[in-house]
Amino acid sequence: MAAPVMSAFGRLQGLIRTERSLLTHVQSRCIQTTSVCLKNRAARVRVGKGDKPVTYEAAHPPHYIAHRKGWLSQHTGNLDGEGGAAERTIEDVFIRRFIFGTFHGCLANEIVIKRRANLLIICAIFIRKMPTQKFYFLIGYTETLLSFLYKCPVKLEVQTVEEKVIYKYL
């Protein structure tokens, strides 16, 4: 009877010694030398062999905003003393994803979202890939659903083109 108790006591002492040695080992090593995984990316299309078609928006890097290209979201939330910029950004992301999913494969360029007082205007250029009746139905569906969701009038300003407009090749 004494032998099993002693062996259990011996195992417990061994575990305590191991734990103490691990604690001193962990406390002495406090620097990690791993490679950094957060890499910066350029927000532009890289110049290649000249076989990559790009649109006007993608051809110019972001520092040309307000010089050669415009803002894709126009509202007064970023002015001094105005609130709600974060909420508008989340709304813009939802609207862009909703329209991309509704008109799948038909977007020719980026969507421009304008807010004027209580009116939400969405400007888009689409490629003619579907029948006109279906296209008009999806426009009405989008306007109605977003109007009920945001509780304000939503208007889609739409232009259609035969194929994607290519600005230049990079």
From Swiss-Prot:
N-terminal signal peptide: none
Gene Ontology cellular component annotations, sorted alphabetically: mitochondrial small ribosomal subunit
Major place of residence: mitochondrion
Molecular function GO labels: structural constituent of ribosome
InterPro entries: Ribosomal_uS3m
Ribosomal protein is among the record's keywords: yes
UniProt cross-references to PANTHER family, sorted A to Z: MITOCHONDRIAL 28S RIBOSOMAL PROTEIN S24 (PTHR21244), SMALL RIBOSOMAL SUBUNIT PROTEIN US3M (PTHR21244:SF1)
Protein name in UniProt: Small ribosomal subunit protein uS3mB
Taxonomic source organism: Xenopus laevis
Gene: mrps24-b
